[in-house]
Amino acid sequence: MAARLLSSVSLTDVVLLLSSVWIAVHLVLAAYNVYLHPLRRYPGPKLAAASQLLNVYHVLKGDNCKWTAQLHEKYGTVVRIGPNELSYISPSANQTIFGGRPKEDKVFEKNPVAYLQGNGDISNIFFARFHDHNRLRKLMAPAFSETAVREQEATIQGYTNQLIAALRNRSGQAAYPDAKGVVNIIPWLHFILFDVLTRLSFGDPIGCLDRADYHPWVSVIFKAIIHSTYTQAAHRLAPYQWILKHFIPNDMTANYEAHLEFTRKQLDQRQQVKEEPVARADFSSFMLKGMSPDELFDNVNIVITAGGETTASTISSSLYYLVHNPSSYERLTKEIRDTFSAEGEITLAAVAALPYLKAVIQEAMRIHPPVPIGLFRVAPAAGAFIDGQWVPGNTWVSVANLAASRSPTYWRDPERFTPERWLGDAKYESDVREASAPFSIGTRNCIGLNLANANMRIILARLLWNFDFEAQPDNIDPHELDEYGIWETKPLNLKIKERVQTT
């Protein structure tokens, strides 16, 4: 009887039965997530509560951060953006999740789904868990201290000299008559920053400024970042991540692997001179003392990849908002040109004393944070209170950088570029400045913030001391760019005129 019954069942029947069971299971799971899950009382769209699909859709679309910001405008300072995930924008939540020096059992650890290990089980400082992070931070901190960065000023100034010379050449009508003095500034910011970072990491620059073009290794960095974003999105769909991974373009994967291979070769060469004295210490000089080769590889790779593009993004957005806000442009150029009578006076110590320059950079990072996404964490196993509400253990939590820094809850005229808000202007005294934390806070804040500030201040000050910049009709508002962990890159064409100095 049983044999006869089985013989009457076709393969199609089996597939239909299994499909029906699969659909039923996931419908039940979705219903549980919406109506019975411990996070059910938190506000947010029902579809986001039901499954990861809506979140992943916006990640792949390149507007996840803007989507999250829209949700916060609608639902408030905390939003449920996934079945087991909450997004916050309040400074108090930021302090709870990232601030202080909590004991190990109170730590909001990195979300292992969002921060995939780049090299097996080897940790880099960005992905590392509590104990590994403390160890790596101690090894790396001396390389990024204010003292260490001051010792690298000659390197930063030297490459800035090259940048200024190249732009001066291209601003002239005779050398490039077809361009009419219009230059896409984005590649040039990449050239100088990746030259600086590779010089400080490998001992030698990658030579972008020399060739006035992207080195192949740099050109694939942006694809490598998108590859990582797609991979992270795929892992949100576990156990079905293989489906999405199947659609990641092969050339993107190949570029990512080529990027890693070149990094390893450069570090292998640097390690061969480990015992030889160098003219000026670089990052590797510090990190070679206590890291394994694999740890060195992972950490140098993340420093270059994350540090170059984010710093370039802030300088370019500063220039964009300056040329589109004449009063701010005039005030900053006046501050720089009135302070310095000769370009050689523009030192790291001197630019640190320019209040409006610092305010411009702070405002650029507020209105266009270089890392717009929230930094993903997991609530302690025992749970925690965030903004007075109980969050169950192992809940995914984050603070949405873009949403927080543009929220009318914390800022007056949040869409307006106004550096004066950082200088005590009474009109903006209601602003909650802590809502903008582009370098994060606490013991896991950005280790490279001193170097980033040095690069941004020196490069921007010297550009505005040497040149006058004019906006072009095809300029794209940085807020309109897509984001894949960091912002995509699009041309920023500016007309550059060599400054006419008067005595």
UniProtKB/Swiss-Prot annotation:
Pathway: Secondary metabolite biosynthesis. One of its GO terms (biological process) is biosynthetic process. GO terms for cellular component: membrane. Signal peptide: none annotated. Its main location: membrane. InterPro entries: Cyt_P450, Cyt_P450_CS, Cyt_P450_E_grp-I, Cyt_P450_sf, Cytochrome_P450_monoxygenase. Its EC number is 1.-.-.-. Heme binds at residue 446. The chain crosses the membrane at residues 14-34. One of its GO terms (molecular function) is iron ion binding. It is found in: Membrane. Glycans are attached at residues 94, 169. Keywords: Glycoprotein, Heme, Iron, Membrane, Metal-binding, Monooxygenase, Oxidoreductase, Transmembrane, Transmembrane helix. Gene3D superfamilies: Cytochrome P450 (1.10.630.10). Its cofactor is heme. It is a single-pass membrane protein. It comes from the Eukaryota. Cytochrome P450 monooxygenase; part of the lnb gene cluster that mediates the biosynthesis of diastereomeric piperazines. Lna and lnb clusters encode sets of enzymes that produce overlapping sets of previously undescribed metabolites such as piperazinomycin-like metabolites or morpholine. The lna and lnb biosynthetic pathways appear to be part of a signaling network that controls the formation of sclerotia, a resilient overwintering structure. One primary function of the non-canonical nonribosomal peptide synthetases lnaA and lnbA consists in the reduction of L-tyrosine. PANTHER family: CYTOCHROME P450 (PTHR24305), CYTOCHROME P450 MONOOXYGENASE ASQL-RELATED (PTHR24305:SF210). This is Cytochrome P450 monooxygenase lnbC. It comes from Aspergillus flavus (strain ATCC 200026 / FGSC A1120 / IAM 13836 / NRRL 3357 / JCM 12722 / SRRC 167). The gene is lnbC.
